[in-house]
């Protein structure tokens, strides 16, 4: 059977609340004002370094490598210590992946989240065993939307990957650059209207994924 690759944040798990909490904990240590959940959700998608860059820019701080590294380190310490208290798996996501595996599909994960945190979250929800390959934000020099991470995930699966499943502009651009079909989960963290994102199919609940795959492969 061929392979299918998933994004993580905003596609399989609603992780923004824990990311939000970790950012605000790091800022509180220095007396910084908290961000709202909506603000932090808007910063998610391009990996931790860009998340912290956006936090600092929103605070009106000029770019500074030392400041970036310092805040990023404290954010990661808080996040890795407590990555899933407020996080939830999207309804139907686990069942959809288990069904795919039962049919013989190879399953990959391509995310801009660090591999350690990704594995930790998947393990806490009993999902880690379902993935045959995981590529994260530090696995390669490039991050999504560069196609290299998605291509590396596909290569690690040793199967023809027929679909990338994601939720955002970053994911759509990654699939397009890699020359793969893209299925858009509409309930994630995208900013643009659906019609502005290149996609081959879309779904609002993971229960719909099986039928979508069948239509795309017909």
Curated annotation (Swiss-Prot):
Keyword Cell wall biogenesis/degradation: no
UniProtKB keywords: Carbohydrate metabolism, Hydrolase, Magnesium, Metal-binding
GO molecular function term, any single one: metal ion binding
Active-site residues (renumbered): 7
Pfam families listed in its UniProt record: Hydrolase (PF00702)
An annotated GO BP: DNA repair
Database matches in InterPro entries: HAD-like_hydrolase_sf, HAD-like_sf, HAD-SF_hydro_IA, HAD_sf, PGP-like_dom2, PGPase_prok
Keyword Plastid belongs to the record: no
Family according to the record: Belongs to the HAD-like hydrolase superfamily. CbbY/CbbZ/Gph/YieH family.
Protein known as: Phosphoglycolate phosphatase
Organism: Cereibacter sphaeroides (Rhodobacter sphaeroides)
């Amino acid at each position: 059977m061929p392979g299918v690759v998933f994004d993580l944040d905003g596609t399989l798990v609603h992780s923004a609340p824990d990311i939000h909490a970790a950012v605000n904990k790091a800022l509180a240590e220095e007396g910084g004002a908290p961000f709202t959940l909506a603000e932090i959700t808007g910063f998610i998608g391009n990996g931790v370094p860009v998340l912290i860059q956006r936090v600092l820019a929103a605070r009106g701080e000029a770019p500074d490598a030392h400041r970036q590294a310092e805040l990023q380190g404290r954010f990661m310490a808080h996040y890795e210590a407590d990555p899933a208290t407020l996080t939830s798996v999207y309804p139907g996501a686990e069942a959809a992946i288990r069904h795919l595996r039962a049919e013989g599909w190879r399953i990959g994960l391509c995310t801009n989240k660090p591999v350690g945190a990704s594995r930790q979250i998947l393990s806490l929800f009993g999902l880690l065993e379902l993935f045959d390959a995981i590529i994260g934000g530090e696995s390669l020099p490039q991050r999504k939307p560069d196609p290299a991470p998605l291509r590396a995930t596909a290569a690690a699966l040793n199967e023809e990957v027929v679909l990338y499943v994601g939720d955002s502009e970053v994911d759509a651009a990654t699939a397009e650059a890699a020359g793969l079909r893209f299925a858009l989960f509409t309930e994630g963290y995208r900013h643009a209207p659906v019609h502005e994102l290149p996609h081959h199919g879309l779904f609002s609940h993971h229960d719909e994924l099986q039928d979508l795959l069948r239509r795309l492969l017909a």
